[in-house]
Amino acid sequence: MKIHEYQAKEILRRHKANVPFGIVIDKKENASKAHDEVTSKTGGSVVVVKAQIHAGGRGKGGGVKVTKTKEDATAAVDKILGMQLITPQTGPEGKKVLKVYLEQGIDIAKEYYLSILLDRSIRKTILMASTEGGMEIEEVAETHPEKILKIAVDPGIGLQVNQARQLAFELGLPAESHKSFQSLVMAIYDAYIKEDASLLEINPLILTKQNEIIAGDCKIDLDENALYRHADNAAFRDITEEDPLEVQASEFNLNYVKLDGNIGCMVNGAGLAMATMDIVKLAGAEPANFLDVGGGANKTTVTNGFKIILGDPNVKGIFVNIFGGIVRCDMVAEGIIEAAKAVDLKVPLVVRLQGTNSELGREVLNKSGLKITGVDDLREAASTIAKLIK
């Protein structure tokens, strides 16, 4: 689950990490009061106004402004709050800014990059750092891979202070900043583990002119499967930042991810769903979604799935690919027929049924009188739906 920067920094504060003071607002009339509170609390005059959206590259899109007066800060809030912010990560449609974060300005000497994530290939947590802070780490990896440092953390013993110290030396940090750096690294690792995060990224990690290390910006992705252990973090969910169809799918307990194609896919099982999307692309078409209905491919589930798929105006056809293990294909077929009637299906529908009672399921579809194309072979089924939408 993605969260906003101000929420990520709230998590870091729980774990005693050094982060700037800031206040989040969602009304323009609160800008002046928030500015005064930040400056009086910190004793500084510089306030950074930051758009709060679930996407990076906010500065490039005009979503981050450094201000030195109250007038400049309120003007920045007036411009940013409510704007449609377009960044390299939002796509051309952008995201509407519903909250802004007013944060104390930091006296920056140098910017670095620091993150913690899981490397599944070695089954260890990785601490990753770079001297190229403030840049997209993907760009650094492509142009200067030698500038990315990695330290693997044994999950049995966790991050050790000597590893944080090693990283400080490898980054070339001034000796006066090592204690501050080690303290922050240990704090964010503690946050990453105890909050069940899947990613914790600080970019930029700031070295101040006073040799203090501060988390200038922070991104945290939380493991949704662990939110039952963190009621406070679950409350961070902002559905206004999520795709409306994905929100609706979660209400139906469906695993749905919207994509950019035009063939809606409904499959039982995540592995088969990914294979189905691959075969659709090989057929020369593009999947419009990932949709795993799991073991509950019944009338209600299929109907809800069709509603979600058809909620995307780009969908020109639907490909249902079901393997009957526990679930019976004849029951699925009945669900498909009822669902097609319930949503008044107008687009081509190709169905592939294999497994338990698959022959009976195909017979049910053939007798339905509906325009449903049944295909046994997976490659042929993908080619069929690709041809039908042309």
Curated annotation (Swiss-Prot):
<dbReference type="InterPro" id="IPR013650">
    <property type="entry name" value="ATP-grasp_succ-CoA_synth-type"/>
</dbReference>
<feature type="binding site">
    <location>
        <position position="50"/>
    </location>
    <ligand>
        <name>ATP</name>
    </ligand>
</feature>
<dbReference type="InterPro" id="IPR013815">
    <property type="entry name" value="ATP_grasp_subdomain_1"/>
</dbReference>
<dbReference type="Pfam" id="PF00549">
    <property type="entry name" value="Ligase_CoA"/>
</dbReference>
<comment type="function">
    <text>Succinyl-CoA synthetase functions in the citric acid cycle (TCA), coupling the hydrolysis of succinyl-CoA to the synthesis of either ATP or GTP and thus represents the only step of substrate-level phosphorylation in the TCA. The beta subunit provides nucleotide specificity of the enzyme and binds the substrate succinate, while the binding sites for coenzyme A and phosphate are found in the alpha subunit.</text>
</comment>
<dbReference type="InterPro" id="IPR005809">
    <property type="entry name" value="Succ_CoA_ligase-like_bsu"/>
</dbReference>
<dbReference type="InterPro" id="IPR011761">
    <property type="entry name" value="ATP-grasp"/>
</dbReference>
<feature type="binding site">
    <location>
        <position position="203"/>
    </location>
    <ligand>
        <name>Mg(2+)</name>
    </ligand>
</feature>
<comment type="pathway">
    <text>Carbohydrate metabolism; tricarboxylic acid cycle; succinate from succinyl-CoA (ligase route): step 1/1.</text>
</comment>
<dbReference type="Pfam" id="PF08442">
    <property type="entry name" value="ATP-grasp_2"/>
</dbReference>
<comment type="similarity">
    <text>Belongs to the succinate/malate CoA ligase beta subunit family.</text>
</comment>
<keyword id="KW-0460">Magnesium</keyword>
<feature type="binding site">
    <location>
        <position position="217"/>
    </location>
    <ligand>
        <name>Mg(2+)</name>
    </ligand>
</feature>
<keyword id="KW-0547">Nucleotide-binding</keyword>
<dbReference type="InterPro" id="IPR005811">
    <property type="entry name" value="SUCC_ACL_C"/>
</dbReference>
<dbReference type="GO" id="GO:0004776">
    <property type="term" value="F:succinate-CoA ligase (GDP-forming) activity"/>
</dbReference>
<comment type="subunit">
    <text>Heterotetramer of two alpha and two beta subunits.</text>
</comment>
<dbReference type="GO" id="GO:0006104">
    <property type="term" value="P:succinyl-CoA metabolic process"/>
</dbReference>
<feature type="binding site">
    <location>
        <begin position="325"/>
        <end position="327"/>
    </location>
    <ligand>
        <name>substrate</name>
    </ligand>
</feature>
<dbReference type="GO" id="GO:0005524">
    <property type="term" value="F:ATP binding"/>
</dbReference>
<keyword id="KW-0479">Metal-binding</keyword>
<feature type="binding site">
    <location>
        <begin position="57"/>
        <end position="59"/>
    </location>
    <ligand>
        <name>ATP</name>
    </ligand>
</feature>
<protein>
    <recommendedName>
        <fullName>Succinate--CoA ligase [ADP-forming] subunit beta</fullName>
        <ecNumber>6.2.1.5</ecNumber>
    </recommendedName>
</protein>
<dbReference type="InterPro" id="IPR017866">
    <property type="entry name" value="Succ-CoA_synthase_bsu_CS"/>
</dbReference>
<dbReference type="GO" id="GO:0000287">
    <property type="term" value="F:magnesium ion binding"/>
</dbReference>
<keyword id="KW-0436">Ligase</keyword>
<dbReference type="GO" id="GO:0042709">
    <property type="term" value="C:succinate-CoA ligase complex"/>
</dbReference>
<keyword id="KW-0816">Tricarboxylic acid cycle</keyword>
<feature type="binding site">
    <location>
        <position position="106"/>
    </location>
    <ligand>
        <name>ATP</name>
    </ligand>
</feature>
<feature type="domain" description="ATP-grasp">
    <location>
        <begin position="9"/>
        <end position="248"/>
    </location>
</feature>
<feature type="binding site">
    <location>
        <position position="111"/>
    </location>
    <ligand>
        <name>ATP</name>
    </ligand>
</feature>
<keyword id="KW-0067">ATP-binding</keyword>
<feature type="binding site">
    <location>
        <position position="268"/>
    </location>
    <ligand>
        <name>substrate</name>
    </ligand>
</feature>
<dbReference type="GO" id="GO:0006099">
    <property type="term" value="P:tricarboxylic acid cycle"/>
</dbReference>
<feature type="binding site">
    <location>
        <position position="103"/>
    </location>
    <ligand>
        <name>ATP</name>
    </ligand>
</feature>
<dbReference type="InterPro" id="IPR016102">
    <property type="entry name" value="Succinyl-CoA_synth-like"/>
</dbReference>
<dbReference type="GO" id="GO:0004775">
    <property type="term" value="F:succinate-CoA ligase (ADP-forming) activity"/>
</dbReference>
<dbReference type="GO" id="GO:0005829">
    <property type="term" value="C:cytosol"/>
</dbReference>
